[in-house]
Curated annotation (Swiss-Prot):
GO terms for molecular function: UDP-N-acetylglucosamine 1-carboxyvinyltransferase activity. Its EC number is 2.5.1.7. GO terms for biological process: cell division; cell wall organization; peptidoglycan biosynthetic process; regulation of cell shape; UDP-N-acetylgalactosamine biosynthetic process. One of its GO terms (cellular component) is cytoplasm. Keywords: Cell cycle, Cell division, Cell shape, Cell wall biogenesis/degradation, Cytoplasm, Peptidoglycan synthesis, Pyruvate, Transferase. The keyword Lyase does not apply. UDP-N-acetyl-alpha-D-glucosamine binds at R92, R121, P122, I123, D124, L125, D306, I328. Phosphoenolpyruvate binds at K22, N23. Belongs to the EPSP synthase family. MurA subfamily. CDD domains: UdpNAET. It comes from Streptococcus pyogenes serotype M3 (strain ATCC BAA-595 / MGAS315). Cell wall formation. Adds enolpyruvyl to UDP-N-acetylglucosamine. This is UDP-N-acetylglucosamine 1-carboxyvinyltransferase 2.
Length: 419
């Protein structure tokens, strides 16, 4: 069993570069199945989710070359075969294969997706959209069968009952090679959706409106190869910004797009965090007094649900009482009992996280229960006095590229060990 060991209390300084966006690349890779030639992605993060996706692509017949942060995929050998259940079950973003396989073959046999357990986030919205496009859905054991019965998937007018990044991307991908026009209303607006649309348009797709709540896709017959730069990971950027404010004495975070983090930065400024926004970087100063605030997550451009857990340790450093309300994933509270083990004055009351600061954290044995909870525990361990041991770290490695090396370069006493 692998663990992360942190000896906390050391102030961090220096520069850290943000990697390519996890939430983009897990959709970009499956979308490449639609291409009729080689596609190259630059800025691909070195995370285990990418490794899993590459393995799935190779099992399906794609030729893959991965060097540094450049990923080259030739999808021409991809075959219409049942997808490997084990990998699918461990990877929530595996549902992005639904749209690309339907777009290319008109059918797919897939296992139900896994990933972090954050409460209800069903794929019903995806399936409702597919059914509107002529897809029949059936189940056999742990597999789901999607089929157009030999017909070409067709365009449709689709209204998303709930704003959903995954369903928006999946529908957009499926519609790219559909017959006719597809309109998605109440679409999610996240930057990652724009990134996927940019890749597809560079391949020859006709997608308009990505980043707004109405997306229009005119289906095309062929998509050529291209080269695409993955956008920076706004969640990783926010994690390092919060970490720098919590335990830094001058940290510069580079490869940052400020416009993707405006709501997050606004809440930090409300706390009193001192930082300087540069063209593609943010410099976070050593902090003095901070004020407790209330956080309420909402769809983009609101405060990202993926950032409420990584921000929590910094909130524990603030003076006063505050609350965290996650309107997206109600079960995103599993980091709370782990922080309590470290001495945090924090609890869950009526579905809301309530904290009282400042809390003095001490090292403890804790468990990462999901990706962003794991990030919160890393920051808390760096803040704490003494030794912190984090288990279940596979969640952390799913989404944070080279996290041990990046933090070590900032002066952290952190290591990954095999037990």
């Amino acid at each position: 069993m692998r663990k992360i060991i942190i000896n906390g209390g050391k102030a961090l300084s220096g520069e850290v570069a943000v990697s390519g966006a996890k939430n983009s690349v897990v959709a970009l890779i499956p979308a490449i199945i639609l291409a009729d030639d080689i596609v190259i992605l630059d800025g691909v993060p070195a995370i285990s989710d990418v490794d899993s996706l590459i393995e799935i692509m190779e099992l399906m017949g794609a030729t893959v070359n991965y060097h540094g942060d450049t990923l080259e995929i030739d999808p021409r050998g991809v075959q219409d075969i049942p997808m490997p259940y084990g990998k699918i079950n461990s990877l929530r973003a595996s549902y992005y294969f639904y749209g690309s396989l339907l777009g290319r073959f008109g059918q797919a046999v897939v296992g139900l997706p896994g990933g972090c357990d954050l409460g209800p986030r069903p794929i019903d919205l995806h399936l409702k959209a597919f059914e509107a496009m002529g897809v029949e859905v059936s189940y056999e054991g742990e597999n789901m069968n999607l089929s157009t019965n030999g017909q070409k998937i067709h365009g449709a007018h689709i209204y998303m009952d709930t704003v959903s990044v995954g369903a928006t991307i999946n529908t957009m991908v499926a519609a790219t090679k559909a017959q006719g026009k597809t309109v998605i209303e109440n679409a999610a607006r996240e930057p990652e959706i724009i990134d996927v649309a940019t890749l597809l348009n560079n391949m020859g797709a006709h997608i308009r409106g990505a980043g707004t709540d109405i997306i229009t896709i005119q289906g095309v017959q062929k998509l050529h190869g291209t080269r695409h730069q993955v956008i920076p990971d706004r969640i990783e950027a926010g994690t390092y910004i919060a970490l720098a404010a919590a335990i830094g004495k001058g940290v510069k975070i580079t490869n940052v797009l400020y416009e993707h983090l405006e709501s997050f930065i606004a809440k930090l400024e409300e706390m009193g965090v001192r930082m300087t926004v540069e063209e593609d970087a943010i410099f976070v100063e050593k902090q003095e007094s901070l004020k407790a605030i209330t956080i309420k997550t909402s769809p983009y451009p609101g405060f990202a649900t993926d950032l409420q857990q990584p921000l929590t340790p910094l909130l524990l450093k603030a003076d006063g009482r505050g609350t965290i309300i996650d309107t997206i994933y109600e079960k995103r509270i599993n980091h709370v009992p782990e922080l309590m083990r470290m001495g945090a004055d924090i609890s869950v009351i009526g579905g809301q996280i309530v904290y009282q600061g400042p809390s003095r954290l001490t090292g403890a044995q804790v468990k990462a229960t999901d990706l962003r909870a794991g990030a919160a525990l890393v920051t808390a361990g760096l803040m704490a006095e003494g030794k912190t041991e984090i288990t279940n770290i596979e969640f952390i490695l799913r989404g944070y590229a080279s996290i041990i090396a990046k933090l070590t370069a900032l002066g952290a006493d952190i290591q990954l060990i095999e037990d």
